Amino acid sequence: MFSEVFELTRQNLERYQVDAQLHACRIQDYKDKPFDIIACNPPYFSTTNQNLMNVNQYKRAGRHEENLPLSELFTAVKRLLKSNGSFYLVHRASRYNELYQYASRVGMLPVKVTFAYDHVGGVAKTVLIEFQFATAHECMIEAPVYLDDRSTFPTIE
């Protein structure tokens, strides 16, 4: 963990008067009560090619899976999510099949999927997935989001 990042997070919570508990540890090591919701924007890139990894330690940790492989992420989520909870994950759309496989290995299925595109006619770059434990029978594919057109963004109610 980076103490500078932790401190910046603490300052932002204080600035915006958010009452929250912070824990500085790897999700793999976190040992507290289960959660109703887990939201995650994990590293997107696998670590198969060391030459492509960023040399900046902060960017490297945030972009490359060397400290949080998908298998470990989903194992931790299985342990930390309540049986009726939801796990929200944003990731590269091109890795959707891999995400689905890791989720199914821990007994989870996608219940809602939204693909995000840079522009109409482009290839999906990002996917937002809501996973739940395998009690769900259907998966809702939401309307696409185009990052260059805010009118396509879902509204928060």
What kind of feature is each model-predicted range?
Residues M1-C40, S46-L52, T75:
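Conserved SAM/SAH cofactor-binding pocket of Class I
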Residues N41-P42, L109:
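Hydrophobic alpha-helix-in-membranes signature
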Residues P42-E72:
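Mobile active-site "lid"/loop adjacent to the S-adenosyl-L-methionine
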Residues E66-A124:
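Conserved Class I SAM-dependent methyltransferase catalytic core
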Residues G121-E157:
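SAM/dcSAM-binding transferase cores
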